[in-house]
Amino acid sequence: MAGLGHRQDRGVMLPPLDEIDGFMVRPGFYNSEGAVPTARGVSFTIHSVGATGCTLLLFRPQEKEPYARLKYPEAYHIGNTFAMLVFGLKIDEFEYAFQLDGPYDVSRGLLFDKNNVLLDPFAKAVTGQRNWGERPESDEGFVYHARVVENNFDWGKMTFPEIPAEDLIIYETHVRGFTRDASSGVTAGGTFEGLRQKIPYLKDLGVNAIELLPIFEFDEMESARVVDGVQLYNYWGYNTVSFFAPNTSYSSVVEHNHE
């Protein structure tokens, strides 16, 4: 199969083969990652070593209970990959997650639980975040879902600067920490926009490259604790989930999780 564009129209003429929970489906794109929008629906692909079954959960935006559960037919499972194209979905009308079934054997490192709700590790947007530093209610359960996002940003005439490695002057920084304090003098402290407003300052210093600490979605309450009376958070964002979803708490505008 060809490489992915911003919208996949391959297979447009291929008809649905099955109906699951009221949705027409057919095998999806096995060499893709995550959710890929097409002209007629969305292909959902997930890879898991050891999984024996997979269910796609569909949620209406901001709702905690799924309105549809689509169990992948056995024929849609090849090797370690589950792939299913669901027809008729509009990407701004739903959120999604997965459930995986399989063996539970600690000695083999297999910890499957078919009741666990799982994020798509290749999600381009994640919903369910709280205000920074707020703990979830104890009865909330799993509140994080994924959104499908079009890769349609117009780069215009922008090109990569191609600065030789020996000429790089790299400034490493944290998006939130760099401009969070009012002394930074920006209008959108602690955000990508605040960082953008500081580019002239960095250039005046002679900096020609910025290296950012993690900017993907992460849970700042992971390992949160109080030490010597001070509340500590996972400030840096080093974890192993949602590498492809920008952190919406670093956005200066309304995003998926702030609707």
In which residue ranges do the predicted regions lie?
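Conserved, mostly hydrophobic/aromatic
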Residues: I46, F98, T173, L202, ...
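Carboxylate/His-rich catalytic cores and anion/metal-binding grooves
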Residues: L202-V230
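Aromatic- and acidic-residue-enriched carbohydrate-binding clefts of CAZyme catalytic domains
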Residues: S184-T191, E222-E259
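A conserved hydrophobic secondary-structure block that centers on an alpha-helix together
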Residues: H174-E211
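Structural beta-strand segments of beta-rich domains
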Residues: R40-F44
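The feature marks proteins involved in alpha-glucan
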Residues: A2-A39, P66-R69, Y76-I170, T179-V186
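Short proline/glycine-enriched turn/loop motifs at strand-loop junctions of beta-rich domains
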Residues: H47-G53
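Beta-strand signatures of extracellular beta-sandwich domains
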Residues: T55-L57
